């Protein structure tokens, strides 16, 4: 374990004494540090009748148990304090450590011994070995009452709301869109779990088209065959325009009632939301238009879908109506809401957070967009190519639409609406222009970057450098598209498409608690986060604060060599079938230099800290009238590296409240690996100038082009080996073209440029 503490805020002596007193601690500045520590331990061991037994089972140093120490006239020393503090946090002397000073340095222990008041205050804010902060662990065990009222410590709300007394209800928000064309505003189901509280509370909202269930069978049937040739496109200039959605006004009258009439049963939830509920934040789950128990079509990422989610925030602020059921006869107001909202969730859920932020809706104070899409084109396409998300060959937008159109899971809804839905889906297939891979109006209407100037909320991103599903380009573009005055924070980790709120190495959920307590509850604090919090890839459990993602002025340039080299596209039938059957086999052979590729290796002569998108400048020609170029850059050679999927450290040990929704403790393993992908990218040679320009490829005519690979942050040291592989067809991402052509690369006039921080 290694500590990386971002949620803790230094406090004045007056504030520390006051907050400790509110918890029942009577720390006296006139007492000796030893006396104050003894009092502190007696308080936190409240579950024990015989506190002396516990003290006798702990040690003060390698020769003295703690009870004996307190009964002696020995003074409290740095060594004794650290030994005791570590035991309080769940570490075992003689098992986890022998030399306490060396161990504190190894785990980057955040407390510096000196001021016992500050030391004990910070100790309560420090994570235990099993993931909870000490104060959260104590509260979960009943240290203070469940008063169903707010109690703050170090700027964070404590779990003093009973999750068992939470109100669970369902309402149906009247949206301002009519996506199914029936002349009525679409109703959207909202599942609510909120604290039992006499006043008003804020909400964390998860906008998830998956929440009401998915139609996996229909989605699987809509997958595309990737074993097709790359199309030769007609040269043209693509034009798009900014469009607006058509909204619909509320209809009819309804009687006002005070209570919701539909009870919410068990639902799937997000553990960050679970953590926030007993801390006084209502949890809202909204599937949106085209989903089970809601109305409308699944419009998949456009601003009609986002408008319906936005209207839930409008309802929380009194600007839209909600009904108790589908009859629309009884209206229910969100009188319990203080109008302040944060959004949460990963992938499609984080995507909707991005989209919602670009509406500038009043009441949306914070978005926590985890691995979210910023432009849907960049999810299913890249530089004029059809590209599948990593791990999902053959998926395209209509297969996602089929997956999330969960109205068809209700047989009656299927009978009434499936015919119209199929017609809608047929039109969507045409609009995708899968045969060309080109940008068009359909994709432009699902590009949130062009509306980023409207963002008013504070923004938190999380994203993985190894996320080849929602690639790092999405967060990079959104991060840089935000207006300069918007506060933004990026947790850039080394995982894949994963959550980070239950990782041992980073206090992410406590940081979100501090931020939301400040922004949604109005609690006064000095809490702030740096622009970028980056997980160091060169060692286990180490995070660093950075000023920016990209925007580097310095580049390291690597020339590709001399002469010309060829890349053949067509494989033998045997190899083609092997690779088409398992793209992982293709990847393994690609990285080993065994496919049809150009392989270039460099040994670094100095340390290199990459920050931003790598740039490839190529001079090449195709033997035919089309072609694609693929590139991957690897940290190559056996070494210990972070692996992208979190592993389980301890099951169900992180209490999200008070014996409530226990979470697993996870972390990225630091393990021996043969290589690591740093970045990758793909380009249709007919889009070599830009996305809106489709050009002719003249056979055997040299072309000069440059394109950026996926942005990343990655640290390399002197002596490390870089491997660049250039090839055509990628059996995981691109269409699997069988055309017998080759690319010739002019190595002398081609180069790789890596942006880096100054040494």
Curated annotation (Swiss-Prot):
Job of this protein: Removes N-terminal dipeptides sequentially from polypeptides having unsubstituted N-termini provided that the penultimate residue is proline.
Subunit-level organization: Homodimer.
GO biological process, one term: proteolysis
Keyword line: Aminopeptidase, Hydrolase, Protease, Secreted, Serine protease
Protein family membership: Belongs to the peptidase S15 family.
Pfam family, one: PepX_N
EC numbers for this chain: 3.4.14.11
Cellular location(s): Secreted
One GO molecular-function entry: dipeptidyl-peptidase activity
Reactions the enzyme catalyzes: Hydrolyzes Xaa-Pro-|- bonds to release unblocked, N-terminal dipeptides from substrates including Ala-Pro-|-p-nitroanilide and (sequentially) Tyr-Pro-|-Phe-Pro-|-Gly-Pro-|-Ile
One cellular-component annotation, GO: extracellular region
Catalytic site positions: 347 (charge relay system), 467 (charge relay system), 497 (charge relay system)
Keyword Acyltransferase part of the UniProt annotation: no
Keyword Protein transport: no
The protein's name in its UniProt record: Xaa-Pro dipeptidyl-peptidase
């Amino acid at each position: 374990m290694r500590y990386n503490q971002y949620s803790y805020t230094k406090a004045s002596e007056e504030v520390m004494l006051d907050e400790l007193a509110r918890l029942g601690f009577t720390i006296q500045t006139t007492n000796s540090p030893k006396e104050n520590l003894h009092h502190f331990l007696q308080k936190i061991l409240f579950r024990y009748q015989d506190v002396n037994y516990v003290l006798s089972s702990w040690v003060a140093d390698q020769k003295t148990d703690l009870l004996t120490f307190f009964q002696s006239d020995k003074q409290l020393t740095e060594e004794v304090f650290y030994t005791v503090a570590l035991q309080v946090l769940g570490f075992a002397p003689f098992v986890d450590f022998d030399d306490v000073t060396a161990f504190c340095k190894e785990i980057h222990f955040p407390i510096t011994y000196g001021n016992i008041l500050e030391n004990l205050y910070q100790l309560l804010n420090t994570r235990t070995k099993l993931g909870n902060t000490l104060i959260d662990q104590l509260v979960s065990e009943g240290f203070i009452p469940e008063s169903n009222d707010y109690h703050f410590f170090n700027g964070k709300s404590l779990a003093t709301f009973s999750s068992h007394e939470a109100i669970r209800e369902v309402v149906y928000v009247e949206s301002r869109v009519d996506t199914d064309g029936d002349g009525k505003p679409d109703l959207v189901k909202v599942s609510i779990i909120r604290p039992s509280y006499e006043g008003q509370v804020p909400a964390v909202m998860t906008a998830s088209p998956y929440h009401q269930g998915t139609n996996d069978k229909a989605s699987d049937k809509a997958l595309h065959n990737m074993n097709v040739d790359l199309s030769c496109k007609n040269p043209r200039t693509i034009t798009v325009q900014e469009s607006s959605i058509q909204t619909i006004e509320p209809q009819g009258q309804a009687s006002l009632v005070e209570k919701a009439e539909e009870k919410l049963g068990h639902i799937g939830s997000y553990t960050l939301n679970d953590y926030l509920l007993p801390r006084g934040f209502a949890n809202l789950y909204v599937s949106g238009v085209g989903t089970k128990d809601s109305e409308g079509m699944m419009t998949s990422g456009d601003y009609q879908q986002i408008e319906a989610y936005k209207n839930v925030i409008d309802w929380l602020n009194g600007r839209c109506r909600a009904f108790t059921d589908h009859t629309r006869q009884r209206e229910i107001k969100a009188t319990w809401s203080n109008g302040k909202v944060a959004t949460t969730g990963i992938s499609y859920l984080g995507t909707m957070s991005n989209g919602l932020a670009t509406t500038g809706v009043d009441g949306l104070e914070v978005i926590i967009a985890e691995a979210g899409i910023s432009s849907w084109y960049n999810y299913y396409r890249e530089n004029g190519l059809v590209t599948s998300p990593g791990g999902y060959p053959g998926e395209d937008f209509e297969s996602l639409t089929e997956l999330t159109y969960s109205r068809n899971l209700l047989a009656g809804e299927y009978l009434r609406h499936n015919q119209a839905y199929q017609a809608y889906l047929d039109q969507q297939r045409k609009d995708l222009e899968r045969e060309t891979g080109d940008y068009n109006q359909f994709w432009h209407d699902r590009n949130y970057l062009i509306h980023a100037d409207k963002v008013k909320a504070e923004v938190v991103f999380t994203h993985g450098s190894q996320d080849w599903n929602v690639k790092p380009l999405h967060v990079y573009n959104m991060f840089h598209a935000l207006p300069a005055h918007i506060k933004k924070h990026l947790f850039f980790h080394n995982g894949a498409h994963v959550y980070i709120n239950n990782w041992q190495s980073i206090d992410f959920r406590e940081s979100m608690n501090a931020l939301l307590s400040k922004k949604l509850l109005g609690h006064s604090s000095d809490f702030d986060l740096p622009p970028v919090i980056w997980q160091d890839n060169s060692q286990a459990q180490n995070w660093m604060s950075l000023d920016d993602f990209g925007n580097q002025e310095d580049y390291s340039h690597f020339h590709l060599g001399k002469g010309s080299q060829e890349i053949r596209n067509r494989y033998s039938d045997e190899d083609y079938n092997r690779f088409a059957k398992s793209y992982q086999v293709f990847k393994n052979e690609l990285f080993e230099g065994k496919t049809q590729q150009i392989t270039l290796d460099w040994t670094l002569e100095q340390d290199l800290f990459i920050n931003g998108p790598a740039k490839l400048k190529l001079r090449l020609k195709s033997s035919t009238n089309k072609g694609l170029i693929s590139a991957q850059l690897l940290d190559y050679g056996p070494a210990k590296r972070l692996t992208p999927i979190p592993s389980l450290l301890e099951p169900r040990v992180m209490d999200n409240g008070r014996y409530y929704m226990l979470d697993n403790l996870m972390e990225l393993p630091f393990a021996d690996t043969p290589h690591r992908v740093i970045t990758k990218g793909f380009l249709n040679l007919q889009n070599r100038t830009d996305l809106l320009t489709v050009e002719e490829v003249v056979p055997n005519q040299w072309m000069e082009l440059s394109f950026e690979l996926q942005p990343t942050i990655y640290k390399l040291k002197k002596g490390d080996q870089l491997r660049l592989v250039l090839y055509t067809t990628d059996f995981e991402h691109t269409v699997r073209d069988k055309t017998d052509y080759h690319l010739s690369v002019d190595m002398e006039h081609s180069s790789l440029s890596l942006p880096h921080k100054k040494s």
